[in-house]
């Protein structure tokens, strides 16, 4: 159906697309320490699962959405140092002050995939 020239163009386009994605993909750098004293209201999240990677691992086997997390982190080239205890928030949604959260309210430093994975989270109380 396709001739050799069309196949070559499709192959070249596919290669260029993946090369562009590899270069343009952000790298997550999980911070440790920090002041942790303030959280902009735009960064407040309500996460279904919060914990270190090993703590969240139990949910990865049970929750269909969460099964993709190791693969997504691998694609991003992210390295999460389990020894440092970097806290992840999984399947999070943005909330505003005064809103309720039936799960865990957190403030996270890095948000990936529109809240599917959040890195460097700290639990907070919304009054």
Curated annotation (Swiss-Prot):
Q: Which GO terms describe its cellular component?
A: extracellular region; fungal-type cell wall
Q: Where is the signal peptide?
A: 1-24
**Annotated keywords:** Cell wall, Disulfide bond, Secreted, Signal
Which cell locations does it reside in? Secreted; Secreted, Cell wall
- List the GO molecular function terms: structural constituent of cell wall
Hydrolase as a keyword of this entry, yes or no, is no
The record's section on PROSITE patterns has: HYDROPHOBIN
Q: How does it assemble?
A: Self-assembles to form functional amyloid fibrils called rodlets. Self-assembly into fibrillar rodlets occurs spontaneously at hydrophobic:hydrophilic interfaces and the rodlets further associate laterally to form amphipathic monolayers.
* Protein name (Swiss-Prot/TrEMBL): Unclassified hydrophobin 5
Give the organism's phylogenetic lineage.
Answer: Eukaryota, Fungi, Dikarya, Basidiomycota, Agaricomycotina
């Amino acid at each position: 159906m396709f001739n050799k020239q069309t196949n070559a163009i499709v192959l070249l386009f596919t290669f260029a697309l993946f090369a562009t994605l590899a270069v343009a993909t952000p790298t997550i750098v999980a911070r440790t320490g920090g002041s942790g004293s303030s959280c902009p209201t735009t960064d407040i999240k309500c996460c279904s699962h919060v914990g270190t990677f090993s703590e969240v691992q139990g949910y990865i086997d049970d929750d269909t959405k969460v099964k993709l997390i190791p693969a997504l982190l691998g694609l991003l080239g992210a390295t999460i140092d389990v020894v440092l205890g970097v806290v992840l928030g999984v399947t999070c949604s943005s909330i505003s002050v005064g809103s309720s959260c039936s799960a865990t309210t957190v403030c996270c430093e890095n948000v990936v995939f529109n809240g599917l994975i959040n890195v460097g989270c700290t639990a907070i109380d919304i009054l």
